[in-house]
Amino acid sequence: MAKRSRGPGRRCLLALVLFCAWGTLAVVAQKPGAGCPSRCLCFRTTVRCMHLLLEAVPAVAPQTSILDLRFNRIREIQPGAFRRLRNLNTLLLNNNQIKRIPSGAFEDLENLKYLYLYKNEIQSIDRQAFKGLASLEQLYLHFNQIETLDPDSFQHLPKLERLFLHNNRITHLVPGTFNHLESMKRLRLDSNTLHCDCEILWLADLLKTYAESGNAQAAAICEYPRRIQGRSVATITPEELNCERPRITSEPQDADVTSGNTVYFTCRAEGNPKPEIIWLRNNNELSMKTDSRLNLLDDGTLMIQNTQETDQGIYQCMAKNVAGEVKTQEVTLRYFGSPARPTFVIQPQNTEVLVGESVTLECSATGHPPPRISWTRGDRTPLPVDPRVNITPSGGLYIQNVVQGDSGEYACSATNNIDSVHATAFIIVQALPQFTVTPQDRVVIEGQTVDFQCEAKGNPPPVIAWTKGGSQLSVDRRHLVLSSGTLRISGVALHDQGQYECQAVNIIGSQKVVAHLTVQPRVTPVFASIPSDTTVEVGANVQLPCSSQGEPEPAITWNKDGVQVTESGKFHISPEGFLTINDVGPADAGRYECVARNTIGSASVSMVLSVNVPDVSRNGDPFVATSIVEAIATVDRAINSTRTHLFDSRPRSPNDLLALFRYPRDPYTVEQARAGEIFERTLQLIQEHVQHGLMVDLNGTSYHYNDLVSPQYLNLIANLSGCTAHRRVNNCSDMCFHQKYRTHDGTCNNLQHPMWGASLTAFERLLKSVYENGFNTPRGINPHRLYNGHALPMPRLVSTTLIGTETVTPDEQFTHMLMQWGQFLDHDLDSTVVALSQARFSDGQHCSNVCSNDPPCFSVMIPPNDSRARSGARCMFFVRSSPVCGSGMTSLLMNSVYPREQINQLTSYIDASNVYGSTEHEARSIRDLASHRGLLRQGIVQRSGKPLLPFATGPPTECMRDENESPIPCFLAGDHRANEQLGLTSMHTLWFREHNRIATELLKLNPHWDGDTIYYETRKIVGAEIQHITYQHWLPKILGEVGMRTLGEYHGYDPGINAGIFNAFATAAFRFGHTLVNPLLYRLDENFQPIAQDHLPLHKAFFSPFRIVNEGGIDPLLRGLFGVAGKMRVPSQLLNTELTERLFSMAHTVALDLAAINIQRGRDHGIPPYHDYRVYCNLSAAHTFEDLKNEIKNPEIREKLKRLYGSTLNIDLFPALVVEDLVPGSRLGPTLMCLLSTQFKRLRDGDRLWYENPGVFSPAQLTQIKQTSLARILCDNADNITRVQSDVFRVAEFPHGYGSCDEIPRVDLRVWQDCCEDCRTRGQFNAFSYHFRGRRSLEFSYQEDKPTKKTRPRKIPSVGRQGEHLSNSTSAFSTRSDASGTNDFREFVLEMQKTITDLRTQIKKLESRLSTTECVDAGGESHANNTKWKKDACTICECKDGQVTCFVEACPPATCAVPVNIPGACCPVCLQKRAEEKP
């Protein structure tokens, strides 16, 4: 009983729980703006309204995805009942009382997939009932009362997979009812009363198709006739239903009519079921409903009443039933009236046809007289005489056995004596895919990238699809199908091994081809043979064995003392890795390292090579004395001849212009270059004497230079040539100076290696040099010599074939300032000293006249088919760079011949040497030493109140090449190339003004500082600004994100890093900037519109400082740099023709070619080929030109390289670097990015005085330095630039992208204020605080410059005298360390009293000097205060308070074609006009 009593209680409790749950669920669904229908169950996006006796569809929330309305009393669905329910996925309407489905019943249900309508009372379905259900997959209509279906009922359901129509009352189905259901998988028509007669045969064919494909299941059972009741519709045949195809019993005949008559075309047919008669005119079905003149009689006859001209044409009768169709012969209705021009009755239509089939293009026309039909190709060319091509009697074009060549346009012409008309159509020949490139079996190493090439043709063009083992490829980033059809698998893994299938698919069919991939595991390199320590005699050849094994096959490289060895006349590396050294000399002694490297890892082994130099005489020893005398004489004669030619007249050709531009101005540089030339010329003369005496040819690469002369004679040659006399001995003892400031020549930056990065030292090498003879002969100097089976191409041919372009693509991101900063920076880093002579040493003839390769000439030959050759030019002027004495030897004895090295005239550091010079001599020439304010010299003052650079003095310069343009000389700056082009000159003007601006501010903040202190502090700030702009603003745009990651963050100074510029950087890599140069220098006014003088072609901007003076100053040029897009480097658009065809051009002369010069300079410097740098940068070795496709994707460029060089091992470095595809986000290719990131990392990390190195600047000062931007420099130092973009390297739209200069952050120089209690001696280079540290190394970095040492300290020199400096008193004290402290102090006091007396004397002298207001001009002549004098015809100078200010007259544009200079007059005049003005 107890158990029984608990039952009802439990049931009540359960009901209560369910009730609560129902309420809770209903509440859950009631979100703001989306109420749940009354009594419905709502949970999230599901709404269930079952068993609620609903008679209409309730309103539900738009986010509803499942709507359940089963078991209600809904009788009809109103159009729009489900509007806005775009998220609905499932709709359940079964078990209701719906009788019909109207049009638009399910509007807006575009995402509905499942629709349940079974067990209703549906009798009819509108043909548009299911329109809009594009996503519907399942439709359930079974157990209804449907009797008929419109054939278009299901045409709007492309994704329908399941359709249930069983248990309805369907008796007949119209053909085509299920035609559009391409995705059908299951169709049920069973349990209907299907009448299986001839009209249902279409359904039988459909069901058979389903069964054969296996993609769909279908059920349909015959109910009638009784004899086949219960049979599947799919099994019935036309024969058992007695169905007969139509057959024609009476055919129509041709007819001729006139206007307004009636014509009859007879057509009778029989068949079962009775066929339907359809009439066609010109292959188009006639509609009896649209034209009342047309009538179809009961027997099938066509009657046309009131005939018109438009009725003429080709008629045909078609009889059709479910068993088939048949057509009568074509008949013609001809219409006759008055003479009429031809009109087409049938125009040809575009027709698709398969290869091998036949095709007919119908064409007929009427007219009076009847027109003649003819056919041609679409371009009016006649049809080919081919038995396959015929014209039918009715005028159609018939082609049988169609081939692919028949594809194209055809024209039908109808002609009578009134007119002719034409109509065209295309025959589109469709063909199965055919493979043109098939994939090959590949064997690769794990981790590599493999390409399976697969290409096919066909019509339509096929699509390439790849599978592996019949299955789809893995969906990951490693598998990529390129647009060409190639399958690329990156980072191949072992499980990628297997069979791959390439399928070419089009609408006609598909073809398949297979390839197999075999993956081998990776193996770290293991040495098979290793070298051992070896001793050889000088002059011998030695082979060092080294080979290794591994997977992938390791690449063998050799290093000597940290520099990679490359293939040359000196070194040869065999395929297995053995290193052969030819003509071993003492310079070859050292440690050699063999490195085996693959993608898995690397292994290395080293050995020591010792060279034994026997004390025996050599063949060249007897000729040393005569050769050195002859060498000195011939070199000096050639140099003097060149000097006379260049400096005693104006430049007459681009050759003169280039030579004058590159000629070193510093006397020390000239002497050092001269010594190197004499040293090398002596060896060449000795070689010639030995060769003549032995009567053998020693000019090949097999000649042993170390057998030429004995070591003691080699040292004698070095002494007599002047090499040892100009060997610098640096002095870095003045640590008070060197810890704070840079020397001008870059010495003592690295205190462990003081010459690292110094000016006038040899370029560094990443790879060993490559010379034909291993010593000094460039590659390609012998045009008949083969390299890897091919001759090297002429540099000019490479330029015209590969590099030069007239097309320029603007850079969408960066301005032309990106290029200009790169050039300005380059002139801070490197400048090669070229030969001092333009004439060959052997006979003194000019290099451009003889076109030979005799030293120092190395002419750029012009190919026979070149445009310049047609004008008679044989070569372009080129002389070799001057060699370093002994080629980089640093010991006191030169006992071996070293490969030729070149001189970097500048300091390697980013230290603003382009502003201040790279030697003490250069620095003093541009300083304003008279004012004692630490300023740089300034030139004429413009209307803006800001000065230009001072003019250079001396003989005629490159800027005065055309006396008809202007007599204005070159500007003087820290780098002698400042006048090369006007954009560069503008940058030099900016930074010279920036120095003077900062120096003026520092003097205001620290009036107690002397001129030297202000100068060096300002120079330090300016150098830091250039460093910051370069690394923070410019380099990220050049290197991109990838390159900046390679460069890495700054972690402090590393004294073990040599910051020197490596030769390949200066000669090839950093010359990539030439590809960024625009052919125009834009000049814009303050509204960023062209100035009156317009933009300037680049060839008119070379050496033209007069344009800055006379044509608006520097502002228009600067706006043209930051206001105009730069040139984008496109692999097919490299150097514009202003640089390759008009470089330094002058009237009636052959201009130079910068691209050809770059290539020739690389060979001159022994730069290894591109392939060696690929290996250095860890790129794959390129044995074929196809191996370059990852870095040079353009096949046309690879083909050009192949035609030019023949072998990848021959490609010069510069052209290869500039044709590499850009790494995304950068302006460099991968090899170029490697080289630049390597160099800039060394420049930063190997610079002890780098601005970010702790202690160089105080934290507060460093914070201010980091406010620097080039935009701020422009605002502060341009003439009147007031609006710029914040980043002048990025393209901005004017005016919206430009802001006021007031918004650009500036450097606050107040943090440089020297806060001191007694400032009388602070900041004085000659003050007491500096006395004890001495200034010996400041002025005398080299031992030979130091005056003779005296036993007593010298007197403090006069401020005005040069060449005298304080002695280092600390060294004097150290020699008396054993004296007592009392004596030391007494001597100290006596010395201090003497120092004070000397200082007073100097102050009196200085006051006396400053009290005079006379001026001394550049010629040493004195002028009284407030006097004026003419310096030349155009320049008037004035003496004002001891300062000389000169003004240059600006000449107006000449009004005649040929103005003439008159002696004593500044501006050219027009003589003709003067003559006219005379009475």
From Swiss-Prot:
Swiss-Prot/TrEMBL cofactor(s): Ca(2+); heme b
Modified residues (Phosphotyrosine): Y1176
Gene Ontology terms describing biological process: angiogenesis; basement membrane assembly; basement membrane organization; cell adhesion; collagen fibril organization; extracellular matrix organization; eye development; hydrogen peroxide catabolic process
Effect annotated for changing Q823A: Loss of bromide oxidation. Loss of tubulogenesis. Does not induce angiogenesis
Post-translational modification, as annotated: Glycosylated. Four sites are completely N-glycosylated (Asn-640, Asn-731, Asn-865 and Asn-1425), whereas the others are found partially glycosylated. Processed by FURIN and the proteolytic processing largely depends on the peroxidase activity of PXDN. The proteolytic cleavage occurs after intracellular homotrimerization and releases into the extracellular matrix a large, catalytically active fragment and a smaller fragment consisting primarily of the C-terminal VWFC domain. The processing enhances both peroxidase activity and sulfilimine cross-links formation.
Sites of Phosphoserine modification: S1180
Annotated signal sequence range: 1-26
Residue(s) at site: Cleavage: R1336
Domain VWFC: 1413-1471
Catalytic class of the enzyme: oxidoreductase
Region ranges (Required in homotrimerization): 1315-1411
Glycosylation sites: N640, N699, N719, N731, N865, N964, N1178, N1280, N1368, N1425
E.C. number(s) listed in UniProt: 1.11.2.-
Induction remarks: By TGFB1 in fibroblasts and up-regulated in apoptotic cells.
Each LRR repeat, start to end: 61-84, 85-108, 110-132, 133-156, 157-180, 182-204, 1151-1175, 1270-1291
Annotated site, Transition state stabilizer, chain positions: R977
Role according to the record: Catalyzes the two-electron oxidation of bromide by hydrogen peroxide and generates hypobromite as a reactive intermediate which mediates the formation of sulfilimine cross-links between methionine and hydroxylysine residues within an uncross-linked collagen IV/COL4A1 NC1 hexamer. In turns, directly contributes to the collagen IV network-dependent fibronectin/FN and laminin assembly, which is required for full extracellular matrix (ECM)-mediated signaling.
Disease in which the protein is involved: Anterior segment dysgenesis 7: A form of anterior segment dysgenesis, a group of defects affecting anterior structures of the eye including cornea, iris, lens, trabecular meshwork, and Schlemm canal. Anterior segment dysgeneses result from abnormal migration or differentiation of the neural crest derived mesenchymal cells that give rise to components of the anterior chamber during eye development.
Similarity comment: Belongs to the peroxidase family. XPO subfamily.
The name this protein goes by in its record: Peroxidasin homolog
Organism: Homo sapiens (Human)
